[in-house]
A protein has these predicted regions:
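Glycosyltransferase catalytic domains, chiefly GT-A lineage
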Residues: 1-224
Length: 224
């Protein structure tokens, strides 16, 4: 979907972070992308980068692959800026426009996580307490969703080395794993993007029941 919406005037360098994609499937992906004259694909095996780290997740639907974001800055040493997309994204526009976002020197460009932000205002106070005492966020309403990221790799390298990122990831108590860590460590260096760049659809009726507990102006921006 990304390449079907790509601009013919731009080149798209697709880099797949992986550990165990078979040679056959790599060839299938390569052959598929060959139909697009302005795209190339490469595969980067992260096995050595994560070797020796005890990485786990707290959610059954989240795999160890979620930590691959932390490896990008080392895997692509000559890149200053990249666009990270979760592999399950459906793209309806030209991501080159998103890549061109001026981050103003910030480390991350990302869309606010309307679900998390709605949870901050729940009466039980669990999420608000977590954001304050575990993530130590000064402004938890700036919490972002990490499925789509414009990454300033130079700034990310200044914040932490890959080893430091992964050492933090080994610590217990993170609910949303690497997403929590990015929010905790990059707070104050985030450019918030329009919601249309990472639309969270209504799952289990959470739009009207969780998301609508977010501040009114934020929820309206999401709905628009």
């Amino acid at each position: 979907s990304m390449l079907r919406n790509a601009s013919p005037e731009r080149h798209y360098d697709v880099i797949v972070l992986e550990r165990n994609i078979s040679a056959e499937n790599k060839q299938n992906i390569t052959d598929f992308l060959a139909q697009f004259g302005n795209a190339t694909v490469r595969f980067y095996d992260v096995s050595r980068a994560i070797d020796g780290f005890n990485l786990t997740t707290n959610n059954a639907h989240i795999s160890i692959e979620t930590y691959y974001r932390f490896i990008i800055q080392e895997a692509l040493p000559f890149y200053k800026k990249v666009l990270y997309l979760d592999c399950d994204m459906v793209v309806n526009g030209d991501v080159a426009e998103l890549y061109d976002t001026d981050l103003g020197g910030n480390a991350i460009g990302a869309v606010p996580d309307i679900d998390f932000i709605g949870n901050l205002n729940m009466k039980d106070g669990i999420c608000a307490e977590y954001a304050k005492h575990r993530l130590h966020m000064k402004n938890p309403y700036g919490y972002f969703q990490a499925g789509v990221l414009v990454m300033n790799l130079e700034k990310m390298r200044e914040i932490h080395s890959v080893r430091e990122w992964l050492e933090i990831a080994q610590q217990p108590g993170f609910i949303y794993n690497d997403q929590d860590i990015l929010n905790m460590e990059c707070e104050g260096s985030v450019t918030h993007l329009p919601y249309e760049w990472n639309v969270m659809h209504d799952c289990d009726g959470r739009v009207h029941g969780v998301c609508d507990f977010a501040p009114a102006h934020m929820f309206q921006e999401y709905m628009d």
